[in-house]
């Protein structure tokens, strides 16, 4: 059997995740400190776990509606109105998915046809490009620079739009840079899009993890943008529910209807137990969100100060739970730096080029880990620089 001829070219050409590569290497290494995976180290709030247990004890284990439990969709709408000033019809404009990644997949599959172009600001989450390619779309990467605080510039977006452009992905707060887009930034982007037929996929999975003085703003709240925006969010990062696998998409009813049809065939429905647990998360856990954000904020300051004091310039992230230090002064590529650091000091980071070509010269550091782990990792990185004779301008 010639499997090479059987396998679809688009699937064969997919790059393995650069995140998982270093995570897997670290898993087999004794006394390794891995700062590679973006997963909260907090336990899911007890009230949420208890709600999941209660749903099982009451035998609520059957298929839910394909689009999700009505009660959950209603709570999602109440949450979005309360926290994000977004307004949706729970029966027609909300789809509950298996994590935010499935919501992204369903959105791209519903909108993108072969040959359509999808604009992806870069550096970016690793799944956008392969999902686009598998749908027959053409990824168009628009670099976001550190000198612009890793924000998408309207002039760069305008230059990237062609008659074939179908979708713009807006991944803010950003993974891996921690960049956020303020209201005025989003207004400039909306102005560029106003006279086009380009849809927006706004990935807001880190919306609650915002450390600036101004709250998160969704582009869908701007005049004329709700009708062209699919908002993706979920429970993994906000409520420390990564293993529960639950996300959602909200947007115009005609798009959500098509996404639900695809979801129906590909997935059927998101896990029932997770959905009952999520209802409690939305109703009762605003305080837990605030506590976790405060802890991440403290860790963020520790990591940013640590890298800057070593002489490795680190942009101050204002969202998510990642730092993106620049390692160009070491003279190594991102892959070389992360590989040597792992081999010599048993600290796992993710090379910046895993998030696109414009991530070269950087590495991603997740601070969703304990202060003890972060402090020890900073100590080992400092030793690594000294032992390799790297004069990075330590302060």
Which residue stretches match the model-derived regions?
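Conserved N-terminal alpha-helix of the aminotransferase class I/II PLP-enzyme fold
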Residues: 63-98
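PLP-dependent class I/II
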Residues: 1-15, 22-29, 33, 37-55, ...
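Intrinsically disordered, tyrosine-centered linear signaling motifs in cytosolic regions
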Residues: 62-63, 206
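Conserved nucleotide-sugar phosphate-binding/catalytic loop shared by glycosyltransferases and other
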Residues: 59
């Amino acid at each position: 059997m010639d499997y090479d001829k059987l396998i679809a070219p688009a699937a064969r050409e997919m790059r393995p995740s650069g995140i998982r590569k270093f995570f897997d290497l670290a898993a087999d290494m004794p006394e390794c400190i891995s700062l590679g995976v973006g997963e909260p180290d907090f336990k899911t709030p007890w009230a949420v776990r208890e709600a999941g247990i209660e749903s099982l004890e009451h035998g609520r284990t059957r298929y839910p509606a394909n689009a999700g439990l009505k009660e959950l969709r209603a709570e999602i709408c109440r949450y979005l109105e309360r926290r994000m000033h977004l307004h949706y019809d729970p029966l027609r404009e909300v789809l509950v998915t298996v994590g935010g990644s499935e919501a992204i997949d369903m959105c791209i599959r519903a909108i993108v046809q072969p040959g359509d172009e999808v604009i992806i600001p870069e550096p970016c989450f690793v799944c956008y490009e392969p999902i686009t390619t598998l749908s027959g779309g053409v990824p168009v990467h628009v670099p976001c620079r550190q000198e612009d605080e890793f924000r998408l510039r309207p002039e760069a977006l305008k230059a990237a739009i062609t008659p074939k452009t179908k979708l713009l992905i807006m991944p803010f707060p950003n993974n891996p840079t921690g960049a956020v887009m303020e209201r005025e930034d989003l207004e400039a982007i909306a102005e560029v899009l106003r006279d086009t037929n380009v849809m927006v996929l706004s990935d807001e999975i880190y919306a609650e993890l915002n450390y600036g003085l101004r709250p998160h703003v969704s582009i869908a709240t701007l005049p004329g943008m709700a009708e062209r925006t699919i908002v993706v969010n979920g429970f993994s990062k906000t409520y420390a529910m990564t293993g529960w696998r639950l996300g959602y998409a909200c947007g115009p009813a005609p798009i959500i209807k098509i996404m639900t049809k695809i979801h129906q065939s590909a997935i059927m429905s998101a896990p029932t137990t997770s959905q009952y647990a999520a209802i409690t998360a939305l109703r009762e856990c605003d305080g837990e969100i605030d506590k976790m954000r405060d802890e991440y904020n403290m860790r963020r300051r520790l990591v940013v100060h640590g890298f800057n004091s070593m002489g490795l310039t680190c942009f101050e992230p204002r969202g998510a739970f990642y730092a993106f230090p620049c390692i160009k002064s070491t003279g190594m590529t991102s892959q070389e730096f992360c590989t040597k650091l792992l081999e010599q000091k048993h600290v796992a980071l993710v090379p910046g080029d895993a998030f696109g070509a414009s991530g070269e010269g950087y590495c991603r550091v997740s601070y969703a880990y304990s202060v003890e782990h972060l402090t020890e990792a900073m100590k080992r990185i400092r030793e690594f620089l000294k032992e390799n004779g790297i004069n990075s301008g330590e302060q």
